[in-house]
Structures are given as structure tokens and as C-alpha cells.
Amino acid sequence: MTGFQIKAPFEPTGDQPRAIAQLTASLQAEHRFQTLLGATGTGKTHTIARVIEKIGKPTLVLAHNKTLAAQLCNELREFFPNNAVEYFISYYDYYQPEAYIPVTDTYIEKTAAINEEIDMLRHSATRSLFERKDVIVVASISCIYGLGIPSEYLNASVPLQVGIEVDQRQLLRDLTTIQYSRNDLDLGRGRFRVKGDVLEIGPAYEDRIVRVEFFGDEIDAIRYVDPVTGTTLQSLDNLRIYPARHFVTPQERLEIACADIAAELKDRLTELEAQNKLLEAQRLDQRTRYDLEMLREVGYCNGVENYSRHLAGRSPGEPPETLIDYFPKDWLLVVDESHVTVPQIRGMYNGDQSRKRVLIDHGFRLPSAADNRPLKSEEFWQKVTQCIFVSATPGDWELDISEDRIIEQIIRPTGVVDPEIFVRPTTGQVDDLLGEVRDRIERRERVLITTLTKRMAEDLTEYFQDRGVRVRYLHSEIGAIERIEILEDLRKGTFDVLIGVNLLREGLDLPEVSLVAILDADKEGFLRAERSLIQTIGRAARHVRGQAILYADNLTDSMAKAISETERRRAIQTAYNQKHGITPQPIVKKASNAILAFLEVSRRLNAQELDTAYEQADELPLEDIPELITQLEAQMKEAAKKLEFEEAAKYRDRIKQLRDKLLGR
């Protein structure tokens, strides 16, 4: 019996019991890698939850974006209501990295907006890893970035125990040392206040308040209290207060780091001057000396992460400490949608280094800034003790490394079989598809259509609209949250047909979609490769009448393999249903906007409308300016995501001017 306890209204069915048993046996035999090859809608998350329960190891579930991470976290919290299921993603609402564009001689400072709630969830994850074994952390790829040294984070924490005498002044100094600030008026996360014999602390990792009551110098009581009503929620005998930031540097380490930074600066200046890069040398000298002064005086400076190698005492090239280092030695990794996530792990390091190289070469940063980086792929896998890859279409690397430990999960608990596939010629494909669409609309079903080009998607959308079809076009400029809104509207029946160039979004749960149409299916490329075709066809695999139509004049190798694999699965599923007398049942799952509630949604004007509104800002009433600022911030975030730094800087400057106007400057 492990510490994990599943609460589920249903037992494993279909292929799930076999998959659970085989995965569990493989892990217990101490095999390092195994793959769950699970068709869409077969309940892979349920299977993984059962395996976690049986194995009982702290588990990291890695998803390739924060939206899917939130979905997985919600599902696992439902399965494990009495265990710690944590959520760990990047805490930036907006992040524009420091950058330099040599062509235009443009330097762009790092600007960021931290989401306090997500920061709290990150701290909650590391606290749980220190205090419990029954922990599941669902994370995005941000977990491979530096997070501070676990041992220093733990050693810096402040223990409290009822009945123990403490020096109250020293206790307050200790809280300040671990980045808590005193605020007797506004108590929040990362703050504390003192009223007589009562000390109240807002921990960085939860929204409850810790109240410590003293009798003289002795701790008389420790309680969790409601931050609004002050009502006691729980009484405790002891408690540990963890730092308000993950990066904690002891004073003696800070002094050594400053000396090391100064030594590196001296060597780098000599190097730049020898290359006759006098401007770069002057720039680096001025910036670094200012940072050193800030570090010595207040222990912090803007861009402090660029000195992380010195602050952590690492050797050049040594990998940073990450979330993985907060796990115990014996832990389990689950890589969701591994065919997307594994390549993402490989790609993070190279993209980070190319930007930093420019900053270093032009005197904005010391060479050691390159060691403030994500893990390299090989460094990441060296830290992994055991792993399950999960995908309907695992990549070749995952299949090779799993050897013969590839466990299939083909049968759906609902009895629904894989879609029936039809291949039709491209001649007259639009009118043929229109007829199919109208049939589905009459049955109140939904349709996904994928094209190869943006132009064709736009033309097809316009053609269908002219013929009375309620259709939407999903394009690349739509952000992740608005994308979820559109998909929810499709499920609710606000419109019936969704058209896009790349509707390949793994993990989409669209049980109302009964038809997937793939235009130009015989044009080989990423969007028409075998795995992409299987994933796209799988969007109709949750409907009892699911079908896929591939419009093509030739049968490509990718098409043949995708059709063969789908028909193989369909045959297995049909035979299972016949043997067990199962009638496929439709999935009844109400549309949920839980993710939208978690991640703030803001309606956005397009860029041209925003430019016009900004130009007319002098004529706007003051009460309308905050809304314009909100819209500009949204565009700034989008530009930064696309690495359009100059565009993002333009929006940043406009926001500053509007805020000055609000303040009457």
C-alpha cells in the first residue's frame, strides 16, 4: 500500500487493466524507459494515475504547454483528492527577455510581469516535495530552467515549534533574510507583521496566514488562520517557513560570488580591449560594476540570474539546479504527448544560447551569463531514473529507447471505435465536403477541416459562410487562451465547422466532432506526415459515428501507414466489442471553461485598431485609458512570445506614456 489513494467513480476497463499491470511490472523490474502507446480517448490519464498509485513514487508529469498541464493537473486532482497534486509552470504573465539587435543597434531591457498565483503554486510544489512522498507535480517545459539550490532553500527555512523559546528579534531578522518583508498594514504573500505578542506571516506557498502567538519568548501557539475573517483553520505543533524566493544565497556565498564576478570582469575587459572592442569594454565595465555594488549593498540586482553560476558556486558549463533536483533520488517521470515534448526538451538550450551569445559579444553580459540556461537534453535525461512516455504516436527515439516495453492501449471504455476512413479525389472536393458538412449539421454534430495553406483556409471559410454554414477559421495569430474559447464554442454549438491550417493540437477533447476532413492529404510534409495524420484523424475518435475523409489523388506512404494503423486499431476495437457484447456509447462530457477561469482571458483589439486608439488617446476620457492599457499589454505579450522585441518595446513605451497621463505627469 502506497501513500497515493485514487478516488474514482469507475474501475479500469478495456485495455486499461492490462496496460496498468504491464507498466507496473516494468517499473518494478527497474526498467528505465517504457512507452504507453494509447489511442485517443482510451483513458491514458486514468491508466497513469493507477500506475502512480501502485508504484508510490513522487512523480513529475511533463506536458508540452501550460494549457495541457492545467488540464492534466485538474484531472489528477480529481483522481487524488487526498494527495499533493501540484502545478508548476512559468510564472510570467508577460516575459520579454533581454536582447540586443546589432543591425539596428537596439538594446531591449528585460521586462516581465509575474503572476502571483502561479508563483504561489510553484512554491507549493517545492514545499510538498520537501515534506511529503505522495506528490505529483504537473509541469511545463519551464521545469528544466534554473530554480536555486534545494539544500540552501531548505537550510534557509525557519523552523517554528510550540513550547520552544526564541529570540523574537532574531526571528524577524531570519524572516527578512529569506526575503520576507515587514508590512504591518497589508499582509500578503511574502510578508509578515507584528502586533504585540502575535506574529503573522503570509507564506509564499499558500493563501492561508500563519499566526504565531508568544508568551514572553516562548511560542505559545501556531495556527493557520483565514486571511479575511481571521478564523482559526488549523492548530499546529510545529511548522517550517520556507523562503519567499527559490534563489537564496547565504551572505558568505554572496561575498565569494562578488569576488568571482569582479575577477571574471577583469579578465573579460582585458580580452575585449585586446580585440580593440573599446565600446563593448566600457559598456560591460559600467554595467557590471553597478550590479556588483547593488549585490554588495542589498543582495540583489536587476538581471541577477545572469550571475547565477557565481552565486551558486558552479563550475563553468556545469548544469543548473532545477525542479528535478528537488525530487528525491527515486522518482518517476511521465512525459505526456512525448512525440512533441521530447523534441521540445532538445530545442530549449539552443534557442536560449543564440540570444545570450549576442549579448555577451557586444558587452552587455559577462561570458558566465551563458550558464544561466535550461538543461541540455543529455543533462536532463541523466537525471531521470525511470520514465513512462505517453502518446498515441510516440516518436522513434522513445520507441527505440523503450525496446520491447511498448504497452498498447487501444480499447476505449465507451466502446467507441477509431474513425472510418475514406479517400476521395480532389476534383470537386469543396462541394463534396459541403454536402458532408450539411449532413453533420442536421444531426447536430461538429466538423473539423484542415487545409495546407492559410489562403485556402480563408477562402474555404468565406465559401461556407456564403452558403449559410456557421463556420470559424482558426489561425496562428490566435493566442492559446482565445483558442480554447473557440474550441469551447465549437463544443457548445455556437458554430458547427472549424477550419484551420494546423488543427493538430494533441490532447484536444472534442467528443461532438464526428467528421474530420483533410484536404490535400497527399502533399507530403510535416502536416501530412504519418504521425500528424493519425493525430488529426484521432480528433473524430471520440464520436460513435466518427469518420475521416482524406481528399487526395495519390496514396502517399504516410497516408498508407496512417490508414493501416487506424484500420488495425479499429479491427481490434470492433472484435473486442463483439466478443463482450459492447454497444459503443457516446461520450457525455459538458463543455468546461475551467482552464479559462484559471488563465485570465482578455478580449483584444487588433493591432491596427490599437494604433488608432493610441493616436487618439488625448481625446479619450481618463476612465477609458485603463482599458486601452490592458489591450496594449496583451499585444505586448503576444509580440514578445513571437520574439518581435522591437514591436513589444513599442507597446511598452506606449503603456508607460498612458500611465503617466493617468497620473497627470
From Swiss-Prot:
The residues that the entry says bind ATP are 38-45
How would you summarize the oligomeric state and partners of this protein? Answer: Forms a heterotetramer with UvrA during the search for lesions. Interacts with UvrC in an incision complex.
Q: Per UniProt, what is one Pfam family of this protein?
A: ResIII
Domain annotation text?
The beta-hairpin motif is involved in DNA binding.
Cited InterPro entries: Helicase/UvrB_N, Helicase_ATP-bd, Helicase_C-like, P-loop_NTPase, UVR_dom, UVR_dom_sf, UvrB, UvrB_inter
What Gene Ontology cellular component terms go with this record?
Answer: cytoplasm; excinuclease repair complex
Q: Where is the Helicase ATP-binding domain?
A: 25-178
Protein name as annotated: UvrABC system protein B
CDD domains listed in its UniProt record: DEXHc_UvrB, SF2_C_UvrB
| Motif (Beta-hairpin) on chain | 91-114
Q: Where in the cell is it found?
A: Cytoplasm
Q: Which organism is it from?
A: Cyanothece sp. (strain PCC 7425 / ATCC 29141)
Sorted keywords for this record are: ATP-binding, Cytoplasm, DNA damage, DNA excision, DNA repair, Excision nuclease, Helicase, Hydrolase, Nucleotide-binding, SOS response
Role, per record: The UvrABC repair system catalyzes the recognition and processing of DNA lesions. A damage recognition complex composed of 2 UvrA and 2 UvrB subunits scans DNA for abnormalities. Upon binding of the UvrA(2)B(2) complex to a putative damaged site, the DNA wraps around one UvrB monomer. DNA wrap is dependent on ATP binding by UvrB and probably causes local melting of the DNA helix, facilitating insertion of UvrB beta-hairpin between the DNA strands. Then UvrB probes one DNA strand for the presence of a lesion.
Share an example GO biological-process annotation for this protein: nucleotide-excision repair
Q: What is the superkingdom listed in this entry's lineage? A: Bacteria
The record's family statement is:
Belongs to the UvrB family.
Q: Where is the Helicase C-terminal domain?
A: 429-595
* One example GO MF annotation: ATP hydrolysis activity
